[in-house]
């Protein structure tokens, strides 16, 4: 049974995200909210702009700012 390249990339991404988030256990709540907002914004920007790099970066920036301001 062979994995397609998309499935392999998705698995590697999931493992990388899980390991990255486990390294953030000592972050403050605001830092975590900023990182989560940036990730969600990047995903939203990529979806809305059909994978455009500029859209992804813009979404990450806006999401990070929103995540930082939540719960202030």
Swiss-Prot record:
Chief localization: membrane
What's in the keyword line of the UniProt record? Cell membrane, Lipoprotein, Membrane, Palmitate, Signal
Q: Which InterPro entries match?
A: Gly_zipper_2TM_dom
Q: Where is the lipid attached (S-diacylglycerol cysteine)?
A: 24
Q: Which PROSITE patterns match?
A: PROKAR_LIPOPROTEIN
Q: What task does this protein carry out?
A: Provides resistance to osmotic stress. May be important for stationary-phase survival.
Protein name per the record: Osmotically-inducible lipoprotein B
- From which source organism is this entry? Salmonella typhimurium (strain LT2 / SGSC1412 / ATCC 700720)
Taxonomic lineage of the native organism? Bacteria, Pseudomonadati, Pseudomonadota, Gammaproteobacteria, Enterobacterales
The gene name reads osmB
């Amino acid at each position: 049974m062979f994995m397609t390249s998309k499935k392999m990339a998705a698995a590697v991404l999931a493992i990388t995200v899980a390991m990255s988030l486990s390294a953030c256990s000592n972050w403050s709540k605001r830092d975590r909210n900023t990182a989560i907002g940036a990730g969600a914004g990047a995903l939203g920007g990529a979806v809305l702009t059909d994978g455009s790099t500029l859209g992804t970066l813009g979404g990450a920036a806006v999401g990070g700012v929103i995540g930082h301001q939540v719960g202030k």
